[in-house]
Amino acid sequence: MRLKCTISYDGHLFNGYQVQPGKRTVQDELEKALAVLHKSKDRIPVVSSGRTDSGVHAAGQVIHFDTPLSIPAERWPYALNALLPDDIAVKQAEIADDGFHARFSAVKKEYRYFVYTEKHPDVFKRHYAYHFSYRLNVQDMREAAKHLIGTHDFTSFCAAKTEVQDKVRTIYELDWTETADGLQMRITGSGFLYNMVRIIAGTLLDAGIGKISPDEVKSMLEAKDREAAGRTAPGHGLYLWNVYYDN
Amino acid sequence: MRLKCTISYDGHLFNGYQVQPGKRTVQDELEKALAVLHKSKDRIPVVSSGRTDSGVHAAGQVIHFDTPLSIPAERWPYALNALLPDDIAVKQAEIADDGFHARFSAVKKEYRYFVYTEKHPDVFKRHYAYHFSYRLNVQDMREAAKHLIGTHDFTSFCAAKTEVQDKVRTIYELDWTETADGLQMRITGSGFLYNMVRIIAGTLLDAGIGKISPDEVKSMLEAKDREAAGRTAPGHGLYLWNVYYDN
C-alpha cells in the first residue's frame, strides 16, 4: 500500500530535508520512525516532493512511502507523531494509488517567505521570519515581481553551485501581501531551482528599499547570470507551503 | 541615572527569569550584557517587575537598573540587543526618576495564556502555545472565570510550595477570546501568586471540557486548598504581557 502524507517541520534544528551522513535531517527522522513502526531493522525509504535547505521550514511538504501495515489512513498521523521528534508533524495521510509519486506527480508548488520590519528584533520570530527593519515600498516590489511571472530561464535566480542544466521554469503567481508586522511573499510555480525563491525574495526586497528599480529585474532575468540578481534572503523566512497534484 | 526597559524573552531555553547558580536565566544574561557594556568586572544589578518560571515567556517584562553611562535612552535597546542572546530583546528604554522601582512601582500586571486546539501538533507552536485538542465550551469557561474576578484569597490557585502568607489578590479582568486556531486567556491583576495564572488556565480549561461545572470554581476558591482547584497548565503557553505603572 502506498501512503501519501502531508507533513510540516520546523527547519531550525535540521540540516535540511535530505539525508546527509552525520547530519540531523528530516528524511532521516522520518525513516527512523517508520522503521520503528514497521519493527524493521532496515530503513523504510521515504520520497518527498523535493528537498528543502538547512533552516527552511515546511508547512505542507508531501511525502510518500510503501507499507504492508494496514493502519487506517486517518490513524497514521497519530502513529507517526508519537514516534517523531516534536519539530516534525504529520498533518494528514491518505492512501494513494501505486502510480502516485510525491515528486514526479507534483504539478505545482507554493512557497511563502515572511519578513518583519519592526525596529527591534522579535524573539518569537527569530527562527521564523526575516528581520528586515527598513521602510519598504511594497508597490515597487509588486512591480518588480511582475517581470518574473511566466516562463523564463531563471539562471540569474539560481545558486551557482547546481548541476541542473535546464533552468527554465514557470512562475504562476508572485505577490506580496502586508501582514500585521511585515510582509509575506507568496509564490507558486512549476518547480523551483536551488535557492531560487530566496534569491527572488532578496532581489525584490532590494527593489523595496530602492537599491534597484523595479524594471532592473527584467534585465537581471535576461542576463542569465547569478551575479546580476540580488542577495539570497536567509532560509529561516522560507516555508514550503503547499504541493499540488492532479487529483 | 535609572533606566526603565521593556523587554521580551522566549522562555523555552531559560530556567526562568531569576538568577540561579549553574542555570541559564534571563537575569543572568541581562547582567552579563550590562557588565560588558559598562566594561565592569562586577555585575550590574537588574531589578524586574517579578519572576517568571522556566519555559514561561515575556512579551512585556519591565526591568530597571542604574547606570553612569550617558547613552541616549532610544539607543539603549540597540546597545543591549547587540550583546544579548537572540532569545532576549530590549524593546524600549526610558529614563526613569530615581524613585521608580520595576517591582514595587507596578500597579497592575497582564498575562496571556495561549491554547491551540487543532487535531495534530503544530511544530511552530510547540514552544509557544498549549496543544489542547478538545472541543471547548468557551461560554462555560467565561462563566467559570467570572467567579475569580475581584478581590479574593487565591490560596486554592497558588502552588503549594510558596513562602507567601497573604494570598489575597485582586483580579481586574479575566476573559477568553477565540483566535484563528484556538483560544487566548487574558488576565490582569494587582499581582499574582506562584503558578496562579497557570492554575487558573488549567482549571478553566477543565470547565471548557465539562470536567467541572462553571459554578464549582466558586467553591474551589472558598476551599482555600490547592487540591480543590484544577491542573497547572504548562508554562510554555504563558506570557507576561504587560506591566502597568502610575505615570
UniProtKB/Swiss-Prot annotation, chains A, B:
GO terms for molecular function: pseudouridine synthase activity; RNA binding; tRNA pseudouridine(38-40) synthase activity. InterPro entries: PsdUridine_synth_cat_dom_sf, PsdUridine_synth_TruA, PsdUridine_synth_TruA_a/b_dom, PsdUridine_synth_TruA_C, TruA/RsuA/RluB/E/F_N. The active site is at residue 53. Pfam families: PseudoU_synth_1. Keywords: Isomerase, tRNA processing. Its EC number is 5.4.99.12. It comes from the Bacteria. Substrate binds at residue 111. One of its GO terms (biological process) is tRNA pseudouridine synthesis. It catalyses: uridine(38/39/40) in tRNA = pseudouridine(38/39/40) in tRNA. Formation of pseudouridine at positions 38, 39 and 40 in the anticodon stem and loop of transfer RNAs. Belongs to the tRNA pseudouridine synthase TruA family. Homodimer. NCBIfam families: hisT_truA. This is tRNA pseudouridine synthase A.
